[in-house]
Amino acid sequence: MASSDALAAVFAHIEDNRAAFLDRLIAYLKHPSISAENIGIDEVGALLVEMLTEIGLETRLVPTDGHPMVVARWEKAPGKPTVLLYGHYDVQPPDPLDKWVSPPFEPAIRDGRLYARGVGDNKGQHFAQILAIESHLKVHGVLPCNVILLLEGEEEIGSPHIAGFVRANTHLLKADLAITA
C-alpha cells in the first residue's frame, strides 16, 4: 500500500471513530492532575499507563524525586527512525473558579469547541498523539517508525526533575527526532 493510501486509511479510521475518541478525551479531561497541589497526579499517571499498554505500547511509570514520568515505547520497526514525543499530564490549578463558564473538570462543548482545564495545555495534545498511534496500529498493525512517549507530571511547576531524569535515563530516550506538543 502506498504511503498516501496508508495514511488515508488511518484518517478514515479516525473519522469513523471521531465521536468515540471525543468521548474518551472528555473522560480523560475529567481527571484532575494538578501538580502544584499534588491532586490526581498518581491517578492520571496510572491511567496513562493503562491506556498506553492497552493500545500495545510497552509502558511504565518511572518514579522521580517528585511526580512520576510515564514512558511508553513501541520499538518494532528495525532500521527505522525513532521519534520521541514529549508532553505533560499535569495542569495548572483552575482558580479562580468563578471565572469559569463551566466547571474546569467537567468538559463542555460550546459553539463547537471543547472547554476544560488541560484541553489546550497539554492533555489534549498528547491524547491526540496517543489516538493517532492507536489508530495507525489498528489499521495497519505496525507503525512506520519507532515511537517513545515521555509524559511528565511536573511541567506546570517548572519541570524540576526532568533534567535529572533525562540524564539518568538517556538509554530510555534515545531518538532520532524529538517533538514537543
Could you tell me what each predicted segment is?
Residues 2-119, 136-144:
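Acidic/His- and Gly-rich active-site-bordering loop/insert found
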Residues 122-181:
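Acidic/histidine-rich catalytic neighborhood of metal-dependent amide-processing enzymes
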